[in-house]
Design a protein with these regions (language model features):
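Catalytic beta/alpha-barrel core
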Residues: 11-20, 89
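Catalytic alpha/beta core domains of metabolic enzymes, predominantly
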Residues: 25, 32-183
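N-terminal active-site wall of soluble small-molecule enzyme domains
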Residues: 1-6
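Terminal or standalone catalytic/regulatory effector modules within metabolic enzymes
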Residues: 180, 186-204
């Protein structure tokens, strides 16, 4: 609460769970200070491996948030991505949950993208694959390192394919080489005036 009092921008509070104590402590503060909140889809029973149970927890949190006067846009749900090296179906479960959250609750989502690859080799490739599929399922944000090129390429590409990059503007701005513009400038500097020939068309 002390931080929310002095923070000048809109805060994203990390976090609220489906546990009763958490709901009654965090949500009133989020409402009071006009913040948004990350909703962790676990409750007193812990983290379920069943994506349908996690969906119900997320739904409960959203309903309680609305009871406190918060809107859907004020809640960002973390579906809790687990390491696929330990739970082989955790990636598929997370994708199923993300899709349901977006389609049924119309809520934004966030996740720790690198959790999925924990303990496995070539983590960047796995993270990139998960991010691409996550965006396709409706994932709207992720906690990740923007300096990791492979993951960032995957995010940009997935946004294009999913129709989230209007006219591919971000993709083009990032990857198109300004060859045409540079060449035209160079050519204009190198051009020499040609002698005029009577009766022939003149070209620059």
């Amino acid at each position: 609460a002390a931080v929310l009092k002095v923070y000048e921008c809109r805060a994203l509070v990390n976090s609220v769970t489906g546990e009763e104590e958490s709901l009654e402590t965090v949500l009133p503060l989020v409402k009071e200070f006009g913040a948004a909140v990350v909703a962790i889809s676990n409750d007193e029973t812990g983290i379920s491996e069943d994506p349908d149970k996690r969906f119900e927890v997320a739904k409960k949190i959203l309903q309680r948030a609305q009871d406190h006067g918060l809107g859907v846009a004020d809640v960002v749900v973390d579906p809790l991505v687990m390491p696929i090296g330990a739970l082989n179906l955790s990636g598929a479960s997370a994708l199923k949950l993300i899709r349901r959250l977006r389609e049924e609750l119309h809520v934004n989502t966030i996740c720790g993208a690198s959790n999925v690859s924990f303990g496995l080799p070539n983590r960047h490739s796995l993270n990139a694959s998960f991010l691409s599929m996550g965006i396709g399922a409706g994932l709207t944000s992720a906690i990740m390192n923007p300096l990791h090129i492979e993951e960032m390429n995957a995010v940009r590409g997935a946004n294009v394919i999913a129709g989230k990059d209007p006219e591919c503007r971000n993709w083009i701005a990032k990857y198109r080489e300004p060859i045409a513009g540079n060449n035209s400038k160079c050519l204009s500097r190198k051009r020499k005036r040609r002698p005029k020939a009577k009766g022939l068309p003149q070209y620059d």
